[in-house]
């Protein structure tokens, strides 16, 4: 397993970049989340990368829930959590059976599927999305499984939140609290799998400045950049990185 003692400078810088992108994704540029998870899976063994990314995500989540702490619509979260937690447990059981060679391409495939979903819902945003309980059940289960195995539930949550017809701040705030609580719920399962341990936490500590810089940068530059162009670039890079994982 890679540790802070065996990582070369290039790999460490790529992980620092991954942390920076996670910070950015939590304060206004969500598309970077998938790219950061994919990049970490390229740099590190696939299983280990999920634990490293999880702690980075939680650090980023803290910034998001502080910034949007009053904007969550809790009734939608309470509807989703039982199914999401069940999905996380299913993902944990699957992770017990999968090795690095199997998980690496699987992460790539999950990322590509999530990107396709994201693209379809952007193109068909006027579709009538169901509000019934089974909608939360299905998306909650899928989000739980994908987040446990690949830290890649973002597009699923976007679909769910779109269906709730929230305003912009409620949309971001509700999503921020979902990911914070969901990611905390994943910690004991990841620790049980050996994906979070003293070595990974030490590495996470060194990556913390990148996350902080990303979160602050996201707040400062969000209104000054073309989000559409930026997201296109991010999605292209994510596709390339996901394909690299698969092949």
Regions inferred by a protein language model and the residue ranges of each:
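Small-residue-rich hydrophobic segments that form or flank transmembrane alpha-helices
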Residues: 11-78, 139-140, 144, 154-211
């Amino acid at each position: 397993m890679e540790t802070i003692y065996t990582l070369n400078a290039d790999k460490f810088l790529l992980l620092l970049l991954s942390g920076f992108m996670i910070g950015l994704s939590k304060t206004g540029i969500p598309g970077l989340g998938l790219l950061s998870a994919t990049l970490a899976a390229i740099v590190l063994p696939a299983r280990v990368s999920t634990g490293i990314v999880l702690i980075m995500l939680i650090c980023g989540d803290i910034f998001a829930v502080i910034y949007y702490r009053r904007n969550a619509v809790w009734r939608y979260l309470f509807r989703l959590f039982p199914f999401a937690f069940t999905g996380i447990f299913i993902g944990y059981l699957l992770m017990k059976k999968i090795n690095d060679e199997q998980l690496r391409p699987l992460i790539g495939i999950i990322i590509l599927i999530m990107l396709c979903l994201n693209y379809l819902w952007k193109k068909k945003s006027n579709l009538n999305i169901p509000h019934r309980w089974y909608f939360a059940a299905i998306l909650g289960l899928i989000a739980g499984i994908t987040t446990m195995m690949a830290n890649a539930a973002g597009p699923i949550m976007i679909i769910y939140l779109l269906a709730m017809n929230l305003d912009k701040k409620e949309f971001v705030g509700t999503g921020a609290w979902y990911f914070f609580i969901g990611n905390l719920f994943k910690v004991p399962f990841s620790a049980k799998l050996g994906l979070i341990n003293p070595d990974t936490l030490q590495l996470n500590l060194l990556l913390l400045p990148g996350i902080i810089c990303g979160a602050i940068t996201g707040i400062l530059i969000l209104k000054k950049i073309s989000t559409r162009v930026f997201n296109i670039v991010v999605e292209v890079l994510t596709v390339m990185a996901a394909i690299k994982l698969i092949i």
